[in-house]
């Protein structure tokens, strides 16, 4: 036993005595070393903490900054010596090491209480898509949060957790069933959809003091024959995508003049005639239109549909039928089908990496390269959740960052450079987990809820200004914020 301990300590000692030449670099200008800083000779026994101390000394920082280190695009999680050995790299080579700011934990900022489960959330801020597309100036303090609830109502909140506006009930032009998806199209327009099979566009306006507002019915879109699970918006082209349980993807125009007539058999008046029920929405008259196209190819409910982040004429959809499908939206034709091993429940595009992230019923996230030249279905798997992954959003600060919302009651932040080798290939690990604040308030923050009983997350949104906004079964919107958590 003593011999084993001696050999281990000798190995550590030899690693500490061995040296390697490293070139330290950073893509972030405010923490970069001066130009001309050459390679430095360091002991191969150094780990992250010692390297962080070294960089802070080189930068002459009065207040130390915690750093993370990347070699060949992967985070260093061992000593340099162990990394060299594991990767078959000679200590004679000059090792390029990139350093980035370490993760700042996302702190809880606020929670907004609702009367029922919250299925969907979106934001309006100076950095949100709805504002940037419209070139609208949203002043600090004037940010808004949109929520869609199982009670069939939309609510717009200010940052002081006050409800500024609520959508009308069904009798006055509102949804006749639970809302499953809601988004700002522009600062003055909202879109929502849900179990009543309709996509609804609303005009949003506020009083001058900003303390009250109205969400007024503007356009009703009919075409789906079953509930709608998610929505995507591309305001510059006035287009929407919807994912429905009727196995189809809806492609819609937000402009009345562009949209085809609504199918007569799907209008509320037809349903009222056939069942002799009182006509709903009788107190208001709202324009009704149909889809530009219904994309039918999936063989099970469609869970998500999104626009390509760089080309709005391309769409992607995921389904319970295990497939990811690529669509040409100009011709409304199917371009490509990728079949995974499990039902796909959520979808997000990482355009700079040419990857699509798909949340699965099998508790993981699959990163898929949709390009025709890709030879494998899954480029990487992100593991950590203990239940279905039903919502995804990309990090506005970093091309490598992603957040997921799961029925296990947590949101997880991922940096796809944080990986490890596994029997299944390259596997990503989450760098931070956000639990529901309500559990902490009840003194149950550490309770394991694999099924997410009472705290399932249904929706997550990540905004550069507001932070991480999540919503779920606990009837709350929760806001967490951590500035620039991952490097670009």
Curated annotation (Swiss-Prot):
Start-end of each WD repeat: 128-167, 174-212, 223-262, 297-337, 339-378, 384-424, 452-488
Region of interest (Ubiquitin-like (UBL) domain), residue spans: 20-101
GO molecular function terms attached to this record: ribonucleoprotein complex binding
Cellular component GO terms, alphabetical: nucleoplasm; PeBoW complex; preribosome, large subunit precursor
UniProt subcellular location: Nucleus, Nucleolus; Nucleus, Nucleoplasm
Stored Pfam families: NLE, WD40
Keyword set, alphabetical order: Nucleus, Repeat, Ribosome biogenesis, rRNA processing, WD repeat
Location (main, coarse): nucleus
Description of how the protein assembles with itself and partners: Component of the NOP7 complex, composed of erb1, nop7 and ytm1. The complex is held together by erb1, which interacts with nop7 via its N-terminal domain and with ytm1 via a high-affinity interaction between the seven-bladed beta-propeller domains of the 2 proteins. The NOP7 complex associates with the 66S pre-ribosome. Interacts (via UBL domain) with mdn1 (via VWFA/MIDAS domain).
Protein's name according to its UniProt entry: Ribosome biogenesis protein ytm1
């Amino acid at each position: 036993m003593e011999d084993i301990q001696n050999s281990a300590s000798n190995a550590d000692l030899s690693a500490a005595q061995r040296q390697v030449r490293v070139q330290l670099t950073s893509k972030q200008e405010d923490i970069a070393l001066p130009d001309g800083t050459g390679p430095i000779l360091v002991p191969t026994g150094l780990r992250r903490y010692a390297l962080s101390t070294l960089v802070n000394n080189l930068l002459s920082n009065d207040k130390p900054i915690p750093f993370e280190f990347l070699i060949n695009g992967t985070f260093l999680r061992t000593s340099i010596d162990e990394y060299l050995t594991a990767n078959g790299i000679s200590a004679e080579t000059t090792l390029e090491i990139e350093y980035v700011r370490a993760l700042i934990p996302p702190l809880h900022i606020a929670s907004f209480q609702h009367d029922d489960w919250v299925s969907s959330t979106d934001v309006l801020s100076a950095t949100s898509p709805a504002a940037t597309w419209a070139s609208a100036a949203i002043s600090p303090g004037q940010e808004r949060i949109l929520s869609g609830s199982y009670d069939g109502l939309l609510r717009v909140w200010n940052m002081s957790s006050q409800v500024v506006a609520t959508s009308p009930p069904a009798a006055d032009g509102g949804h006749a069933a639970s809302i499953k998806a809601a988004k700002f199209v522009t600062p003055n327009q909202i879109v929502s959809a849900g179990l009543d099979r309709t996509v609804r566009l609303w005009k949003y306006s506020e009083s001058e003091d900003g303390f009250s507002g109205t969400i007024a019915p503007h356009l009703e879109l009919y075409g789906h024959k079953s509930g709608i699970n998610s929505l995507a918006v591309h305001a510059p082209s006035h287009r929407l995508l919807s994912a429905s349980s009727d196995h189809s993807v809806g492609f819609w125009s937000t402009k009345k003049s562009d949209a085809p007539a609504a199918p007569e058999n799907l209008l509320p008046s037809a349903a009222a005639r056939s069942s002799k029920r009182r006509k709903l929405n009788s107190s208001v008259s709202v324009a009704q239109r149909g889809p530009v196209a219904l994309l039918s190819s999936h063989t099970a409910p469609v869970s998500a549909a999104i626009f390509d982040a760089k080309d709005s004429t391309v769409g992607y959809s995921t389904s319970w039928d295990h497939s990811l499908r690529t669509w040409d939206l100009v011709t409304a034709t199917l371009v490509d089908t990728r079949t995974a091993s499990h039902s796909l429940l959520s979808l997000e595009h990482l355009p700079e990496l040419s990857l699509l992230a798909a949340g699965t019923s099998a508790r993981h996230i699959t990163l898929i390269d949709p390009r025709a030249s890709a030879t494998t279905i899954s480029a990487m798997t992100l593991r950590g959740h203990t239940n279905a992954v039903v919502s995804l959003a990309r990090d506005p600060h970093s091309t490598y960052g992603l957040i997921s919302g799961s029925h296990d009651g947590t949101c997880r932040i991922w940096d796809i450079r944080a990986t490890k080798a596994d029997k299944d290939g390259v596997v990503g690990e989450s760098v931070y987990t956000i639990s529901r604040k309500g559990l902490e308030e009840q003194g149950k923050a550490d309770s394991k809820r694999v099924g997410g009983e009472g705290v399932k997350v249904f929706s997550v949104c990540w905004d550069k200004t507001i932070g991480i906004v999540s919503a779920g079964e606990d009837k709350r919107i929760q806001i967490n914020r951590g500035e620039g958590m991952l490097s670009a």
